[in-house]
Amino acid sequence: EVASRFHTQYGQRQLRVTVQPFFATELLLPKLSSFIREYPDININIDTEDQSAEKHPAQADVSIRLFRTAPKNLDVQELFRLRLCTACSPGLLKQHPGIENGSLEGLPLIVHSKRPNAWRDWSRSAGPELSDPSSVIRLETMISVARAAEQGLGVALVPLQLSETWFRAGTLVRLSDHYLETADSYFLVAREGDGQRAEVHAFRRWILQEFGEA
């Protein structure tokens, strides 16, 4: 209601965006100020819920979501393929320097519960068979997986493109140049025809400029 009154009084355009949490915190929000400076007349409402990963939320003007295949009957643009790489905390690496040589034997593994086979797929693509871990920690969201690795709870598979700031800051250490190319991609999605709206067109152009083929 307040936003509606503001729009009526000041002519501000409203844009409702839904983004999965890790993408929002690591990519979108750090760069959003440049969009706001360029389009000060667009008010953005960002929802970071993660309950509709495989569909475009009905209440959203624009969403950024992981899809295995491009959704039909929507205006879609692929941003980049999801790639997973092994990572752990500097402290865990110091305790187990063999990790950098690919030896994960006897170490705790952190598993994203929505991707239960990711470690198996990574092992097959990397070459050596994955040794039995000392324990397995399962977590519901990708950002909680990364946080657990940051806290030294184990070795995790984290999204390569979304974790670059953690690697640069030294809070996570990438353990290998190898990465697992998944079958999923991040897509920018809007309803058919909404791309003609000025605020949707502006946001899409900016997103593609910042994150296309990241």
Question: What residues fall within each predicted segment?
Answer:
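Alpha-helical linker/hinge and terminal dimerization helices associated
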Residues: 1-9
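Central regulatory/effector-binding core of bacterial HTH transcription factors
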Residues: 11-72
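Short loop or secondary-structure boundary microenvironments that flank
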Residues: 21, 113, 190-193
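Short amphipathic alpha-helical coupling segments at ligand-binding clamshell hinges
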Residues: 27, 195-209
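C-terminal regulatory
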Residues: 57, 69-153, 158-183, 210-214
